[in-house]
Amino acid sequence: MSLLVDTSVLIDHLRGHPGARAVLEQGLAAGEVHASEVTRLEVLAGMRPREEAPTRRLLTSLHWHPLDDAVAERAGELGRAWLPSHGGIDAADLAIAATAVLLEARLLTLNLRHFPMFADLARPY
């Protein structure tokens, strides 16, 4: 199964967390690790100047997916289904979830409550 990585795991990797490094290295060794362009935006927006080189190296190792019409449509469907009972989900999380659904990918995230639409979601480390 392919993997879609969320911002939280990438940030942990950049901070040297062994679990994040291991899960990404395993994913990359097994094939492509995917990410939403929303994740790239979040990572770049929070990047400090001294983190630029390692951040850009990490970002080049991922397969990126745009927020296109298919993602927007699916994100809208997910929002209508889940926002009435889970108001804390934001548009970025809906777009990331929609990308994972469309790719049929396993989502790697630490923010489990942002993604209630994945019944079997668990922390990756």
Question: What role is predicted for each listed range?
Answer:
Residues 30-32, 61-63, 101-106:
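Short active-site oxyanion
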